[in-house]
Amino acid sequence: LEYHIEQGDKLDNADLDVGVVSGIVSVIRYEVTAKGMSNHAGTTMMVNRKDALVGMAKLIVAAEQRARELSDTLVFTVGKIAVSPGQENVIPGQAVANFEMRHMDKAVTDQFYADIQALAKEIPNCEFEFVNTSAKYSTPCDPRLIKLIDDVCTEKGISHIIMPSGAGHD
């Protein structure tokens, strides 16, 4: 049994002392590649551009919005983007980003991934490729241990909530 500080803001926002961990969330990662067409930035008219970075940006915004709609406990992060060729006077022909999603329920992450793929198909002037780079699925905690900690907190008057660990390593 480990005591651990919360690395998020859920307990602070709710003004609670303790989070009783119900399980460790899934952490699913994809490398997403947007393919457009590199061309000269000054001579290619806007109507003819196939900018991979613009396509990736549209997908990220759409995915972030979908994550908020799908579940209030689903989290979605893009922490890394690489653009090629990476020159300020060249329209990006390729953008590669790392998409990460976390949730306790595999059905939610599966649905979210399917939704992202569908959203990608709606974005013009780009083709998208998805490669799963990591899949660590959720692990529920022993219900007897959860109940024991919950009961002790209640008995001692310690404000608490039963919640999943979003950090993925507790």
Language-model segments: residues:
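Midchain, well-structured core segments that form catalytic/ion-binding scaffolds
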Residues: L1-A107, S134
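Charged helix-capping and loop-helix junction motifs
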Residues: D17, I116-Q117, R144-K147
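Short, solvent-exposed loop/turn segments at secondary-structure boundaries
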Residues: T44-V47, Q111, P140-C141
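Short secondary-structure junctions
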Residues: A67-F76, I123-E127, C153-I158
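Extended hydrophobic-aromatic, low-complexity segments
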Residues: V90, V108-F112, I161-I162
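Short amphipathic alpha-helices in soluble, non-transmembrane regions
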Residues: F112-A120
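An extended, acidic, His-containing surface patch that forms the Zn2+-binding/catalytic region
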Residues: E129-D170
